[in-house]
């Protein structure tokens, strides 16, 4: 009987802790540093190749694109 009461009280305490923590963290950002890092990796200036329609006089075009010299060298479909 005592063991059952102790287990019930322990489960209730853990549940209350979970609810308090969830309420406190509701407006907080989760894994903010990971999102910032991913944003920096996908930033337009950090990519190694130039995408469709981008200038290609300082970078190579991405795979499947070719640098065409119009007025300004631009990556176009091959």
Curated annotation (Swiss-Prot):
The lineage of its organism: Eukaryota, Metazoa, Spiralia, Lophotrochozoa, Mollusca. The modification Pyrrolidone carboxylic acid is found at residue 48. Keywords: Disulfide bond, Knottin, Neurotoxin, Pyrrolidone carboxylic acid, Secreted, Signal, Toxin. Its main location: secreted. It is found in: Secreted. GO terms for cellular component: extracellular region. Residues 1-22 form the signal peptide. The presence of a 'disulfide through disulfide knot' structurally defines this protein as a knottin. The cysteine framework is VI/VII (C-C-CC-C-C). This is Conotoxin ArMKLT2-0313. Expressed by the venom duct. It comes from Conus arenatus. Pfam families: Conotoxin (PF02950). Residues 23-47 form a propeptide. Disulfide bonds join 49-62, 56-67, 61-75. Belongs to the conotoxin O1 superfamily. One of its GO terms (molecular function) is toxin activity.
């Amino acid at each position: 009987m005592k063991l059952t009461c102790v287990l019930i009280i322990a489960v209730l305490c853990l549940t209350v802790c979970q609810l308090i923590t969830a309420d406190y963290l509701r407006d907080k950002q989760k894994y903010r540093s990971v999102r910032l890092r991913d944003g920096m990796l996908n930033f337009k200036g950090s990519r190694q190749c130039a995408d469709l329609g981008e200038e290609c006089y300082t970078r190579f075009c991405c795979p499947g694109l070719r640098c065409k010299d119009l007025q300004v060298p631009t990556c176009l479909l091959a």
